UniProtKB/Swiss-Prot annotation:
Keywords: Cell cycle, Cell division, Cell inner membrane, Cell membrane, Cell shape, Cell wall biogenesis/degradation, Glycosyltransferase, Membrane, Peptidoglycan synthesis, Transferase. The keyword Cell wall biogenesis/degradation applies. This is UDP-N-acetylglucosamine--N-acetylmuramyl-(pentapeptide) pyrophosphoryl-undecaprenol N-acetylglucosamine transferase. One of its GO terms (molecular function) is UDP-N-acetyl-D-glucosamine:N-acetylmuramoyl-L-alanyl-D-glutamyl-meso-2,6-diaminopimelyl-D-alanyl-D-alanine-diphosphoundecaprenol 4-beta-N-acetylglucosaminlytransferase activity. UDP-N-acetyl-alpha-D-glucosamine binds at residues 14-16, 126, 162, 190, 243, 262-267, 287. It is an enzyme of class 2 (transferase). It comes from Vibrio atlanticus (strain LGP32). Transmembrane segments: none annotated. Pathway: Cell wall biogenesis; peptidoglycan biosynthesis.
Length: 353
């Protein structure tokens, strides 16, 4: 009896690492592969991955950035211990290939796989490579990048995006008969973005009628943001902590105001929605670089955080009529790379032969 091939996915910490890993995992599951996950017990993958029917093993590992001297001295021992933990899981399950999607867990897991003679495939979601993937790229059999620039020679494939987002109708079809209020979707990620939560109520008060807003405020921010909109007499708004059906939200929206994390940029492009990006201020400008290609092709606008004011945002939105928004949405969809999950899955299959 032929035994199914096995993939171990290493990804954790944030949705930007976990969701693309799930997209590749689902693609291979549909082809009969067995999937297992390596993560950490105190991050989002611990809850999210089992909900998708995938078993998960845990190792203890933390990031090194921002640690005090005493913790840095202990770091080599903690890393070695994490590698040994990962190697025990790998030895017990015997995967054919290991896929690293980033996050702290990928480092020890990737080294353990390499020491075990198991091929490692990497995917970097951001325009600036994370420290873990920089290290692992030297031992990986195949390296992919979502945006140009993370690695000098890696294949650019985009980010694996959820199937329900990819399946949305083209923006020309979706937006053809729309009239009435311009629909604005505000997203700051699962934790929200304070600057968006503070700025949008003032912006919408300045813009007045003609707009409807759905605002994802993030965990524990909902009531405060509702009060801010009320204090500025803005009624045509729905504020929520989370958006469960992101694809439906993209389908509804005419314009997105959001951060430019790697997964958000890829999803916005795949969905075909015009955007105003307000990048988080990383030292390496990671989020700004993620969004550059959509800005350059006319699919999005960018306001860097130091320049963001309610006045500037209101003036920017006021200049976008329905025709302009449709054009931006179409350009976003044209720029999308919709088969990243297939490309990564095929590379994994080739290495397992």
């Amino acid at each position: 009896m032929k035994q199914n091939k096995k993939l171990l996915v290493m990804a954790g910490g944030t949705g930007g690492h976990v969701f693309p890993g799930l997209a590749v995992a689902k693609k291979l599951q549909q082809q009969g592969w067995e999937i297992r996950w390596l993560g950490t017990a105190d991050r989002m993958e611990a809850d999210l991955v089992p909900k998708h029917g995938i078993e998960i093993d845990f190792i203890k590992v933390k990031g090194l950035r921002g640690q005090g001297v005493s913790k840095l001295i202990k770091a080599p021992f903690q890393i070695i211990n994490a590698i040994l933990q990962a190697r025990r899981h790998i030895k017990a399950w015997q995967p054919d290939v290991v896929l690293g999607m980033g996050g702290y867990v990928s480092g020890p897991g990737g080294i353990a796989a390499w020491l075990s003679g198991i091929p490692v495939v990497l995917h970097e979601q951001n325009a600036v490579a994370g420290l873990t993937n920089q290290w692992l790229s030297k031992i990986a059999k195949k390296v992919f990048q979502a945006f140009p620039g993370a690695f000098p020679t890696a294949e650019v494939v985009g980010n694996p995006v959820r199937e329900d987002v990819v399946a949305l109708a083209d923006p020309e079809q979706r937006m053809a008969e729309r009239d009435g209020d311009i629909r604005i979707l505000v997203m700051g990620g699962s934790q929200g973005a304070k600057i968006l939560n503070d700025t949008l109520p003032v912006t919408m008060a300045q813009l007045g009628e003609g707009f409807t807003v759905v605002h994802q405020a993030g965990k524990n921010n909902q009531q405060q943001v509702i009060e801010q909109y009320k204090s500025h007499s803005v009624d045509n708004v729905q504020v929520t902590e989370f958006i469960d059906d992101v694809a439906q939200a993209y389908e509804w929206a005419d314009l997105l105001v959001c951060r430019s994390g790697a997964l958000t940029v890829s999803e916005v492009s795949a969905a075909g929605v015009g955007s105003i990006f307000v990048p988080f201020m990383h030292k390496d400008r990671q989020q700004a670089l993620n969004a550059d290609h959509l800005v350059e092709c006319g699919a999005a606008l960018m306001i860097e955080q130091p320049q963001l004011t309610a006045d500037k945002l209101a003036n920017t939105i006021a200049q976008l009529d329905r025709n302009e928004l449709k054009m931006m949405a179409t350009k976003a969809r044209q720029a999308a790379k919709l088969d990243a999950d297939v490309t990564v899955a095929e590379a994994i299959k080739a290495l397992a032969k």
